[in-house]
């Protein structure tokens, strides 16, 4: 199909004499990111504060800010022309950047606005039938819980939630995997978990669970296969793994947390042989999807990216700056990011373990923890502890769960000195 004829059919063809705005932005990567101080210098974070809650909502590094500014300027100058000139190429570019980061095929990556959107689309679009069983846990976020409830109600399926550990700091991988897999029933069709629990900091052994499910599936027909879905947001941007390493079927994450990407962006990844299990909820605006509807592209099977990236117009200045966020991580190196985040987190946990009035909930082992560190201060609620820390200019967060712990989450924008200051502030928090 000719682009011009597609645009005429959508009523958007430009006048003959129109001058198209300059092509899409390419960020200069002339800044060296080989020291953590240089990495930090890329952010406009207030240097008078210690920022320990980037996992909640991130600040953007310079290349992301520059890309957003550029796209916003171009949209403000001539929105329709800028969109027309770039829409067909920009979204596939973003999928490609995400796919490169997770070592997957770009056709497997749908663009979303958040983890919540990805999970909502995944679970409510999941093909279940009456009597099918969904197995989940008691440690998941509101976004998973509610999406599963809507899915169960829609399909007359059941949900069972198992508790994998009573106390995260004492849990073992074997115990958790054993508890989860033992709860799988013949009618279980969907297992839904969270990679890193934002309520406790626990990191689940996703690959071991995937292998256990694969082994159960080897004795089932394709029709009875269990699908394994993961809310991956708090491992994404921390751990040095690929989708193949994780071994799940679907993976949802936003990119406005540990990836430091534009606010209102995220991905939903689907393994090719699982695509058929999900039906779309929001029509995609991809070139192939819309073109087929217009009758200008022969009807055919759409890939996951083209079918499951929800359409409607978006805050494109943000969405189209996602590539720069992935590039930023790749320029530093995924392993370096993982090692640094674990190093600072371990330092914090070791320090907190020695404070009498602190109860650390997150496992110390990096096998079972990622970048989130959860704790309680004796005699204080999590909100009170976080408020008290903020008077010392330390920005943490209280986990938004019915039972809430305080969280400090050092990342690659922090340093050892800041971690020491957090430990010192917590030593004196009751004074
Ligand atoms: C485990 C988990 N899943 C999902 C979400 C929702 O994230 P989003 O803002 O990307 O929808 C959060 C929020 O922090 C979370 O902690």
What kind of feature is each model-predicted range?
Residues 5-431:
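Pyridoxal 5′-phosphate
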